[in-house]
Amino acid sequence: MLGASGTTERSGEVYLPYVGHVSDHIVLLEDGSIMTMAHVSGMAFELEDAEMRNARCRAFNTLLRNIADDHVSIYAHLVRHDDVPPSPARHFRSAFSASLSEAFEERVLSGKLLRNDHFLTLIVSPRAALGKVRRRFTKRYRQKENDLTAQTRNLEDLWHLVAGALEAYGLRRLGIREKQDVLFTEVGEALRLIMTGRFTPVPVVSGSLGASIYTDRVICGKRGLEIRTPKDSYVGSIYSFREYPATTRPGMLNVLLSLDFPLVLTQSFSFLTRSQAHSKLSLKSSQMLSSGDKAVTQISKLSEAEDALASNEFVLGAHHVSLCIYANDLNNLADRGARARTRLADAGAVVVQEGIGMEAAYWSQLPGNYKWRTRPGAITSRNFAGLVSFENFPEGSGSGHWGNAIARFRTNGGTPFDYIPHEHDVGMTAIFGPIGRGKTTLMTFILAMLEQSMVDRAGAVVLFDKDRGSELLVRATGGTYLALRRGAPSGLAPLRGLENTAASHDFLREWIVALIESDGRGGISPEENRRLVRGIHRQLSFDPHMRSIAGLREFLLHGPAEGAGARLQRWCRGNALGWAFDGELDEVKLDPSITGFDMTHLLEYEEVCAAAAAYLLHRIGAMVDGRRFVMSCDEFRAYLLNPKFAAVVDKFLLTVRKNNGMLILATQQPEHVLESQLGASLVAQCMTKIFYPSPTADRSAYIDGLKCTEKEFQAIREDMAVGSRKFLLKRESGSVVCEFDLREMREYVAVLSGRANTVRFADQLRKVQGDNPSAWLSEFMARYHEAKD
């Protein structure tokens, strides 16, 4: 930047009109203007219906009409940059989960995330020019102190009006922050981020705020600009609108939110007086008429605009827009510029790259630099509301009901989404997706990441598996796993597995009665009930290895076939169902951390399945005492097919929900679940729903049953292409599409989602090397591809 002589370099401070803070949230400019800035989180838009977005646009236009004043200007900035806050330190119980988290961060996320930051700036100019601020601390300026006070009061009133109207957008007013006894100006940091596309702390100084911001050298040329820092340099280029789109719509510039490189989008809007606005419209109309312009429609629209302006349907303002993109070298810059230009052209604008005006265009990005604005144009507040929508991709939450976010995913915009398992304090989650889409892998990944919430709280995870799909995760994290068998001793022997307690007595009485009555031949007599109670008492007084259903049966009468003893006979060892609950050993060992049960072979055996569920849930119930607890169920539709099992599960889940518990369910098609009364009830209670792409998705099931919006249904059925490795997360607080692409982590996928051949291969390794994960897991992950079908 050359000075007036043309031979010396002009100081960047010339372009930085910021004197300093007059309060924590207000900054004084050299021309006497004052400004305040806010960071805007932004509203989710990707899956919003058009009606909602149009309503927000109308509300924003109404706000602009309410604050319209020719001494007020608004700046809106979008800064897309790679300064993404790191994930919090993660602590796990098992080495596998820690390794999984680290690999996911490094292979899937590292270097692939960008952040979108919106900023809103309000500037109030003085009613009368006060002269240069450096001459302001004089007697003349002291006479104007009352004007500054009124100006500040006006700005505060504006801020409160704007903050109230845009509360849902997540506004946070920037001010002064303290870190390690040093004060930093957030306004200065935001201005520097707008200037450079990089975040750098800016301390509060006693001198000029502008001077404290300009610490890197900016060199502007016709082909672009260069920013030189002490450690590196990078280049940029700026694009502006030569002609505006014929029409505007909400979020029309959101195409920039997902570009894979840093950029700064700047827009300013300075309100015009009503007379100035009418003059501009009248002048344009007169020019077209006097030149014989045949664009009758445009002339008519100008007349309509004058009527709308007179009716206060909108206000007019001087608008300026520029897009600055950055790259490490000129070759990359040219490629990025072409892509950005195409995106803007797709929005309907005629875009031009700045050349001679590069220097002015660069400095015009900063709030208050009106004189450097290139190609300003008059637009309506409705147009401005469409161009500046303050929409963004959801960023999730850094903390929730159980502490820090347990995982970070990548959104469609390449931005981070921090995942917490709860919506408010409700941890009910349902995962839907056709077979082979990856829902089991995602479910087990979440279970592994949940170790962070459990490790210091004595929390526990219990999962009901299908076809041993989650067995390897359970074993890799040091848990216990039991695959229940059919036709051979199942592994369940309640009389041998329960301790001699009052709770065990009560449970066994109800459970044995249910076994007897499962034949559908009615209840048992009071006498038989008394004999049963005595028998249970006697059995539990024995050592566990001496207990059996066959021994209990001896306490019941050897009477007719309709008697309780005869009806219990089939459940005794050596009889038709003796294998189910009267084996030599009860293999239910609840791990204090994670336990898995595979009931695949019992699901179609109604009588056995319901009784097995009752026993398992009784054992598990001891862990549901207020500590953190997670119950997971893969392919849970299969469990709903058994009414007795479903009834047992429903009763148990009520206990889970009341005692700080979580539930994660996974199944293929929602319509199968919604057909069940319990299934529909469970899904309704799931505040978090996760959907995988489904080209055959049933409209009624998704929209009527699962309450998806039209845009969400469209994403599930069409937009999320099969094989894209994306899922849609739906919550009341907003929906988002995230990537879960583990193609660079195939050895971990082999553990998260077991197949018949990989499970057998792991069995072989464990038989030779032992069950401790440290003995077999690393070899399995290195050789899993050797597994034979």
Curated annotation (Swiss-Prot):
NCBIfam families: PRK13853.1, VirB4_CagE. InterPro entries: CagE_TrbE_VirB, CagE_TrbE_VirB_cntrl_dom, P-loop_NTPase, T4SS_component. One of its GO terms (biological process) is protein secretion by the type IV secretion system. A possible function of virB4 might be to provide the energy, via hydrolysis of ATP, for translocation of virulence proteins of the transfer of a T-DNA-protein complex across the agrobacterium membrane. GO terms for molecular function: ATP binding. Residues 1-38 form the signal peptide. Gene3D superfamilies: P-loop containing nucleotide triphosphate hydrolases. ATP binds at residues 433-440. SUPFAM superfamilies: P-loop containing nucleoside triphosphate hydrolases. GO terms for cellular component: type IV secretion system complex. The gene is virB4. Belongs to the TrbE/VirB4 family. It holds the Pfam family CagE_TrbE_VirB. Coiled coil: none annotated. Keywords: ATP-binding, Crown gall tumor, Nucleotide-binding, Plasmid, Signal. This is Protein virB4.
